[in-house]
Amino acid sequence: MNKNTWIIGFTLFAMFFGAGNLIFPTQLGLESGHFFWPAILAFALTGIGLPLLGVVVGALDKHGYIGSFNKISPRFSLIFLIIIYLTIGPLFAIPRTASTSFEMSVTPIAQNSGNLALFIFTVIYFLIVLYLCLNPNKMIDRIGSLLTPLLLITIVAMIIKGFVDFSGHSSNYGMTNAYHSNLSGFSQGFTQGYLTMDAIASIAFSMIVVNAIKTTGIQHADKIFKQTIIAGLIAAIALVFIYISLGYIGNHINIPSDTLKELKAKDQNIGTYLLTTMATKGFGTFGKYLLGIIVSLACLTTACGLIVSVSEYFHRILPKIPYKVFVIFFILVSFILANQGLNSVIKMSVPVLSVIYPVAITVILLILIARFIPTKRIAQQIPLIIVAIESILSLITTQGWIRISFIDDLPLKEYSLEWFPIAVVATLVGYMISYFVKQSNIVYQKE
């Protein structure tokens, strides 16, 4: 394993590690109580396992997901990738990184921070993103060898101090009845990890990893696949360590019930409160600044990864427009949306994400199956169409636009996984139908 693989692995970690990856495991630790271990391990399984799988599957074809999706349908490839890149890019995730950085780094320090402060912060934030992203090859090196070590050092410093301050406390009793057994703890952790939606980002980040590996001189798909697995494992190990550590500390922070009630009444994020408590307990007033640095670095690296992946994709389908033009354009769009505030960005994006997320996971699994089982195009098309229809109907019901009664009765609906049994059945039906259809089997390009 050479130096480049380590740099790519650490870059992948940094791109995946956003502010939510700090908040979710810490809050899970508090809520799970005595059932922490099954909850956090299940959280890691879906919160890390699915994104890692998404990155690795993207390396099965020499041309990444573009090549794999084209085998399903060139039209599907174009439409679905445009939706994914715009949704997790300038229309949602990138503006959210800036808004989250502001709310967790500036707001706690400057009590009266308003629209002007947000404007100034986002100008500086996106100028840094612009500098890092204008050259995508240098971006990998800058993040992997500079920003990631700085991010890891600050996180580890807070974790070590957190262990010293809180590990002597007894495990709390949890704050919700959802955790009442090892099985319920596992199912809750599994669902929370799934709901991070990092698997969608893996489709975008996979292209960066594949292209970065190609720049080292590796061109054969099998070797690219092997290096992608190694880089993915490096990122996964770092994420597992941080998730379990933050979750463990959160599990040993005892918050009075009155404080919890007050937080809920104010609709304040409990995970953010726990992180602030951990930072200020360990480092006093400086803790607020330390947490701000950690969150800003985490969000900055994620924003860079998304800007590069989105810009590279659109430059690929519209080669007459230079890559740098796309970078500037998407940063401007993200800047405008970031100044609408965090809550506005989230409200706009959640409905779209709830539709494309099941389709994204389904297509990742279908491509993986096709790697080992002879598969015709129609065997992938049928389950994708059915899952997309179910996801749209589920959204319509959830939003209250039209009441579709059978949607609420679907298995696993309470875990937001009602699409999964449907995907399994549709896949089996698709493979059965494919036996009667004259199509050649899908072959992923290696040379």
From Swiss-Prot:
Domain of life (superkingdom): Bacteria
Q: Which residues form a coiled coil?
A: none
Record's bilayer topology term: Multi-pass membrane protein
Quote the subcellular location field of this record.
Cell membrane
GO terms (molecular function) for this protein are: L-isoleucine transmembrane transporter activity; L-leucine transmembrane transporter activity; L-valine transmembrane transporter activity
Can you name a GO cellular component term?
plasma membrane
Q: Which GO terms describe its biological process?
A: isoleucine transport; L-leucine transport
The record's listing under InterPro entries reads: Brnchd-chn_aa_trnsp_Livcs
Give the primary localization class: membrane
Which regions span the lipid bilayer? 5-25, 40-60, 74-94, 114-134, 143-163, 193-213, 229-249, 290-310, 317-337, 350-370, 382-402, 417-437
Q: Which UniProt keywords apply?
A: Amino-acid transport, Cell membrane, Membrane, Transmembrane, Transmembrane helix, Transport
In terms of Pfam families, this protein maps to: Branch_AA_trans
Q: What does this protein do?
A: Component of the transport system for branched-chain amino acids (leucine, isoleucine and valine), which is coupled to a proton motive force.
- Similarity comment text for this entry: Belongs to the branched chain amino acid transporter family.
Q: What name goes with this protein?
A: Putative branched-chain amino acid carrier protein SE_1090
Q: What is the lineage of its organism?
A: Bacteria, Bacillati, Bacillota, Bacilli, Bacillales
